[in-house]
């Protein structure tokens, strides 16, 4: 073929082009939900999209009718250091005091605890301590406990398909890792087969830095000191919010920790105690009137 018959090369725009096809297609249920929501919101899609993408807020881009153009000077792509990655990824897992408590209590329930004691020192700013009479941790599993303090290490699931059979509160393998990254974590445990308990101290990377014999009844106690101390700005915000809400703290805390809703526990004046009776209740409240209202309407 002659030179005149060759097609001219397609002009390439400056900068990289990122194409994403079939978003959520690997998660069938989520993919269907995504498609259903998009179809419902077609009329207001441009406005809702610009609102959610805050950098497009106020933009006249009527997506997907016309594309939006953003200009940003190119910067070199470099890896984030491991410590920063650990702290950044831990933030969305533990969002608040109540989230931290729910994660720890959930682990206690998964371990078969029927009695759980919760103690907060200085409204949880100084110390969160959760003790449960579960099965405890065998010494041969201490290394596994250390691994569970690394992200995505758990005893609950092995592969994605296991999610359809999950019967536990925790399964992602993020809770202990995130707590270690955001605070000082100590775990005291005693397995039913052990003669004496053990205290394990973790560093912010989730590794065991100290292991000592410790008298402890059967079960496990998780102590979290100085929550959010590794994130100075968030730590100050956390302290400020707690101080602002001291008057209504017990009620707000019990509301956020749904398993404490309706509890008379005036935290942190007195510790809360949870007991698993095995009784199925359709209503979280123990008051007859509220139970009838929730059940009947």
Curated annotation (Swiss-Prot):
It comes from the Eukaryota. Pfam families: HATPase_c_3. One of its GO terms (biological process) is mismatch repair. Gene3D superfamilies: Histidine kinase-like ATPase, C-terminal domain. Highly expressed in kidney, spleen, adrenal gland, esophagus, duodenum, colon, bladder, ovary, cerebrum and cerebellum and to a lower extent in lung, liver, stomach, uterus and pancreas. Not expressed in heart. GO terms for molecular function: ATP hydrolysis activity; ATP-dependent DNA damage sensor activity. InterPro entries: HATPase_C_sf, MutL/Mlh/Pms-like. GO terms for cellular component: mismatch repair complex. Belongs to the DNA mismatch repair MutL/HexB family. Encoded by one of the numerous copies of postmeiotic segregation increased 2-like genes scattered in the q11-q22 region of the chromosome 7. This is Putative postmeiotic segregation increased 2-like protein 2. The lineage of its organism: Eukaryota, Metazoa, Chordata, Craniata, Vertebrata. The gene is PMS2P2.
């Amino acid at each position: 073929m002659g030179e005149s018959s060759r097609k001219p090369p397609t002009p390439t725009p400056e900068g990289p082009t990122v194409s994403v096809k079939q978003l959520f297609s690997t998660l069938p249920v989520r993919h269907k939900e995504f498609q259903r929501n998009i179809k419902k919101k077609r009329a207001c899609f441009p406005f809702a999209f610009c609102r959610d993408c805050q950098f497009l807020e106020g933009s006249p881009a009527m997506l997907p009718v016309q594309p939006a153009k953003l200009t940003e000077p190119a910067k070199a792509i470099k890896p984030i250091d491991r410590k920063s990655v650990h702290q950044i990824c831990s933030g969305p897992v533990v969002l608040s005091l109540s989230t931290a408590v729910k994660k720890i209590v959930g682990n206690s329930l998964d371990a078969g605890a029927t009695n759980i004691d919760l103690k907060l020192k200085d409204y949880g700013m100084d110390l969160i301590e959760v003790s449960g009479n579960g099965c405890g941790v065998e010494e041969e599993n201490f290394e596994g406990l250390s691994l569970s303090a690394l992200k995505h290490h758990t005893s609950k699931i092995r592969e994605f398909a296991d999610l359809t059979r999950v019967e536990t509160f925790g399964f992602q393998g993020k809770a202990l890792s995130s707590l270690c990254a955001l605070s000082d974590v100590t775990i005291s445990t005693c397995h039913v087969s052990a003669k004496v308990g053990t205290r394990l101290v973790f560093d912010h990377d989730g590794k065991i830095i100290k292991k000592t014999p410790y008298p402890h009844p059967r079960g496990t106690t998780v102590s979290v000191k100085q929550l959010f101390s590794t994130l100075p700005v968030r730590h100050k915000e956390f302290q400020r919010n707690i101080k602002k809400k001291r008057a209504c703290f017990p009620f707000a805390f019990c509301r956020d920790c749904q398993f404490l809703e309706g509890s008379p526990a005036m935290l942190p004046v007195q510790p809360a105690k949870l007991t698993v009776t095995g009784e199925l209740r359709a209503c979280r409240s123990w008051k007859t009137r509220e139970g009838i209202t929730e059940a009947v309407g």
